[in-house]
Amino acid sequence: MSRKSSKQFSGGKLNKKHKFFLNPYQDCAFTKCPKCETKTKIRKFLLVIHVEPQQLFLLNKQCKYCAECDLIIAKKQEVESLMAAGLSQTNPRIMGNDYLVIGTVERKDWKAGNGGSLSAHEIVERMSVFKDQWNFEVIPPGWYPS
């Protein structure tokens, strides 16, 4: 599996934490880290997602996590279905718009954001953006001529 860097949210003075991979493969669960081959663990993360135009969406989601690489792996299909369910109730006109998972937020800030006591600007100030966003290409097993 090869690693490719993708576009990254430029957060200025924001705290940078974790690396992130949005897994587009339905049939690949990444039970092992695609970089270091260590077994991944399941952990809940509070993801901050920017939805065009200028909308923040907070998602409490179980993701695969490699502690060695500090890599969070989230399945794209699961993220999109959870976003669709949430946005259909709060803001249905932006469903299907482009989005970018930009970072994580602490649980106390997530609760305050969902309760409506934090503005989007305050959430951005308190969140941790990803250090890097990775892409991995899955190469199916088999014989390949050299």
Residue ranges and their predicted role:
Residues K39-R43, K75-K76:
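Short, non-ligating residues that shape and space the ligands of small metal-coordination modules
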Residues M1-F9:
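A boundary/linker detector
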Residues L47-F57, S81-P92:
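Short cysteine/histidine-rich metal-coordination sites, predominantly Zn2+-binding motifs
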Residues Q8-L22, K44-Q55:
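Short Cys/His-rich Zn2+-coordinating modules
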